[in-house]
Amino acid sequence: MVNATLSVVQKNSAFVGSATGELAARAIGMLYPGVKQSDLSEEQKQTISTLATVSAGLAGGLTGSSTASAAVGAQSGKNAVENNYLSTNQSLTFDKELSDCRKSGGNCQDIIDKWEKISDEQSAEIDQKLKDNPLEAQVIDKEVAKGGYDMTQRPGWLGNIGVEVMTSDEAKAYVQKWNGRDLTKIDVNSPEWTKFAVFASDPENQAMLVSGGLLVKDITKAAISFMSRNTATATVNASEVGMQWGQGNMKQGMPWEDYVGKSLPADARLPKNFKIFDYYDGATKTATSVKSIDTQTMAKLANPNQVYSSIKGNIDAAAKFKEYALSGRELTSSMISNREIQLAIPADTTKTQWAEINRAIEYGKSQGVKVTVTQVK
């Protein structure tokens, strides 16, 4: 997808093509001051690559004629239009077929089944597209699905002035159900940076990012600002948790583990020293690994990428877990529907470190592991 995005950008203008290198260079200077490009670790290069892709995609949107030009090529747009759940035209056709059938008094279940099958077949492609090309799903698929959904909400009186409207409340309900499901799927499963790229490449939003022309430094700053935002789901006091940062597992890790357990069933806790996971809720089939990372150590402040590496290691362990038994408690992969990591970090975590945390969260999604972050102050 990186190559697809950059190719669109480079086709828009020679300037944007050459600007991609500057985007990366500026990102390196902002995130890793004093570090030469040749000295970047592989994971640091991945971070820069992601930022450059977001920024370059945004730049492409500024030089192109539409949001789609920033995200995907014309062919991918064509494919999306031809292969989507129920589009505007499909919704109208379904509405007409169902309305005519009801008026004739026939058995209309075959019509409903036919269109549900079409919707399901086209919707099934979204799962793979969210893995292979999430930016296309955000830019084009979402708009087509939304078009079909919006058709159900057009008031009937518009039909009196020549505007096409749906007339069957039954058909509207089906389209809302089918397309609403796909819209939710796209929103929930799209990587966060693609949502930023779509937002930033919209002409109505570009005024906030560009003044007097294409300003590469502003675009890069915007991308970094988005990626480095604080995404903690909660903030708690250290005294409430009973933990002390930098004081070892007994005063940092264990108190946090106990705190997380307060919101889980009493029998969810696994035996001490259980492999990978600390809790298992049989009712929800959720296995939870409780972790805490002190981001304020000299090593992690000097090299924020260590934060990503630590979380990634925890994610990989949770994703690859197969089975384990200890003290009469057994846990197997077949018992697990949800794998989660409850992560605690200091409230003083830097923006650069947050960029690494957010990258790890997105990586977790790709591995089927949900990472929830709580900051402890």
Curated annotation (Swiss-Prot):
Span list, region CT domain, sufficient to interact with CdiI: 88-377
Intracellular or extracellular location(s): Target cell, Target cell cytoplasm
Lineage top rank: taxon: Bacteria
Required cofactor(s): Zn(2+)
GO MF term list: deoxyribonuclease I activity; metal ion binding; toxin activity
Annotated region (Has DNase activity in vivo, cannot be expressed in the absence of CdiI), positions in chain: 222-377
CDD domains assigned to the protein according to its UniProt record, in alphabetical order: CDI_toxin_EC869_like
Inner membrane translocation domain (IMTD), targets to YciB: region residues: 85-233
Motif (VENN CT cleavage motif): 81-84
Pfam families with a match to the protein in the record: CDI_toxin_EC869_like (PF21111), CdiA_helical (PF21483), PT-VENN (PF04829)
Active-site residue numbers: E257, D278, S289, K291
Keyword Transcription: no
Matching InterPro entries: CdiA_EC869-like, CdiA_helical, VENN_dom
Listed EC numbers: 3.1.-.-
Record keywords, A-Z: Hydrolase, Metal-binding, Nuclease, Target cell cytoplasm, Toxin, Virulence, Zinc
Main location: cytoplasm
Residues that hold Zn(2+) according to the record: E257, D278
Free-text remark on how the cofactor is bound: Bind 1 Zn(2+) per subunit.
Primary role: Toxic component of a toxin-immunity protein module, which functions as a cellular contact-dependent growth inhibition (CDI) system. CDI modules allow bacteria to communicate with and inhibit the growth of closely related neighboring bacteria in a contact-dependent fashion. The C-terminal 289 residues (the CT fragment) has a strong DNase activity in the presence of Zn(2+), completely degrading supercoiled and linear plasmids, and inhibits growth. In the presence of Mg(2+) it nicks dsDNA. Expression of this locus confers protection against other bacteria carrying the locus.
Quaternary organization: Interacts with cognate immunity protein CdiI-o11-EC869, which blocks its toxic DNase activity.
Domain remark text: A beta-hairpin (residues 322-332) fits into a pocket in cognate immunity protein CdiI-o11 and helps confer immunity protein specificity. The inner membrane translocation domain (IMTD) targets the toxin to a specific target cell inner membrane protein (YciB in this case), which delivers the toxin to the target cell cytoplasm. Exchanging this IMTD between CdiA proteins alters the inner membrane protein delivery system but not the CdiI immunity protein, strongly suggesting CdiI recognizes only the toxic domain.
Name this polypeptide is given: Deoxyribonuclease CdiA-o11
Lineage: Bacteria, Pseudomonadati, Pseudomonadota, Gammaproteobacteria, Enterobacterales
